Amino acid sequence: LANGDEVDPDGHVLNSLIETVMRLQREFANLKYAFLTVHKARSFGSGSERLYVTNKEVKNFEPLGEICSQAGGRIPSPQLENQNKAFASVLERHNKAAYLVVGDSANFTNWAAGEPNEADGTCVKADTHGSWHSASCDENLLVVCEFYFIL
């Protein structure tokens, strides 16, 4: 078929395939542009390339990793002040605290006065102002996941 032999002597099949590929390339370019536009708009207000989104459920820490992973995200781990502000804005809107993960080599932290205090628990939660507190991993807090897009 590709060489236009007796099965498709006029090359109609090949021409149809070429047209289909070109149409799919245009559609892909349009979808990519739309996606990047929405992402840039969502991150513009927060100044962060990371998006923090809630499903409005409250859960303890145990299922959080799986919930976020299934959604294509991860447990929040703000690495910069603007990321922490974006995370805190979600908490403020819902007037609830949420879990976060603090890496061992974190360059940015936002511990509240007197924190971390392992007597309060081994997990970390952020309040509606974005301050971090030690917490029990059994507390039911707002489910928030972090999504990071490499542009």
Curated annotation (Swiss-Prot):
One of its GO terms (molecular function) is phospholipase A2 inhibitor activity. Its main location: secreted. Keywords: Calcium, Disulfide bond, Glycoprotein, Lectin, Phospholipase A2 inhibitor, Secreted, Signal. Residues 31-146 form the C-type lectin domain. The keyword Amino-acid biosynthesis does not apply. Glycans are attached at residue 107. Oligomer. This is Phospholipase A2 inhibitor BjussuMIP. It comes from Bothrops jararacussu.
